[in-house]
């Protein structure tokens, strides 16, 4: 990639139909883990006009009212009015869960004496990434995109812009010079709204109250192209506007396209699924490498075979920014991080009901107390081991 370029990332609000599905799936996962931390959960959700469908594979001793969990999640998001196309009180909720396949379970359940050789729940490849563009060590375009839709939600919830509805999308284009963020070029924000708000009033309020407070002043170096509700109308939204499905916002969930993605979604999956747990571990590794000053950006790829605990491969790239060679960073990673599935669960304390909070506004780059994968507690040891 050239040193001078434009790069774009997007995010969506908690009321976006795919994020509604993600939050229902993770709310169900949390409700199960609260009673049965070793449950096997793969909870998928579909939501459409007036309808929620819950399907997947769950093996648990927990007693959970899945229908009520789904309704509560819709209520918390703000779908409490039939005008919005789905109302938590009156929507239909269908439940169709099976148990985990015994063929899969036999590969995951086996463990040796130390209990840490539990096999991976599936084959696959996962990526972790960090860079020094923000204090949170995240790419700036996805960071700003998340903050925009978070602010839309905040102003909707506190009533300052009481004509806002739950569904919204953001998109930020930055200009990079010498590989670093230089200026903001374009901001797109589309937000669902009540029928009686004029487009002129909406655009002015969105730019002044939502967008401008989020943008870093040092990146405003000329006229920014603001595109607010460019279709002119966004009354019909949420699950009524589009059918929502779990796992369809995997780039929003991660790095906004700034790093590769292995393809596996997160929400609704318990930590035995390496799609989720190994991606969290990859973020933990990459963030600690950058926090340690070993590199200004770091990408890690981890791969697994089903039923096998040890990763089939681990790759580290610092994109030429490393203070030491990539092979040495990879060696330090293997010495300081246990990337077996059960080792990850133990290292990051993942058998907790912490996942609903991850299901909107990004799984990474948020300083939430539950997000153990955002800690930089290994940075000092890595730096010392590297001799820096």
UniProtKB/Swiss-Prot annotation:
Q: For this UniProt entry, what is the primary localization, expressed as one broad class?
A: cytoplasm
Q: Which residues bind Mg(2+)?
A: 18
Q: Which residues bind K(+)?
A: 44
Reaction catalysis annotation: L-methionine + ATP + H2O = S-adenosyl-L-methionine + phosphate + diphosphate
What keywords sit in the KW lines? ATP-binding, Cytoplasm, Magnesium, Metal-binding, Nucleotide-binding, One-carbon metabolism, Potassium, Transferase
**GO MF terms, alphabetically ordered:** ATP binding; magnesium ion binding; methionine adenosyltransferase activity
Source taxon at top rank: Bacteria
GO biological process: what's one of them? Answer: S-adenosylmethionine biosynthetic process
Enzymatic class: transferase
Q: What is its EC number?
A: 2.5.1.6
Q: Which cofactor does it need?
A: Mg(2+); K(+)
Q: Region annotation Flexible loop: residue ranges?
A: 100-110
- Pathway the protein contributes to: Amino-acid biosynthesis; S-adenosyl-L-methionine biosynthesis; S-adenosyl-L-methionine from L-methionine: step 1/1
Give the matching InterPro entries: ADOMET_SYNTHASE_CS, S-AdoMet_synt_C, S-AdoMet_synt_central, S-AdoMet_synt_N, S-AdoMet_synthetase, S-AdoMet_synthetase_sfam
Q: Which residues bind L-methionine?
A: 57, 100, 242, 273
Sites binding ATP sit at 16, 167-169, 233-234, 242, 248-249, 265, 269
Mind telling me which GO cellular component terms the entry cites? cytoplasm
Cofactor binding note: Binds 2 divalent ions per subunit.
Q: Where in the cell is it found?
A: Cytoplasm
Subunit composition?
Answer: Homotetramer; dimer of dimers.
Q: Write out the similarity annotation.
A: Belongs to the AdoMet synthase family.
Output the NCBIfam families linked to this UniProt entry: metK
- Biological role stated in the UniProt entry: Catalyzes the formation of S-adenosylmethionine (AdoMet) from methionine and ATP. The overall synthetic reaction is composed of two sequential steps, AdoMet formation and the subsequent tripolyphosphate hydrolysis which occurs prior to release of AdoMet from the enzyme.
Q: What is the protein name for this chain? A: S-adenosylmethionine synthase
Q: Which gene encodes it?
A: metK
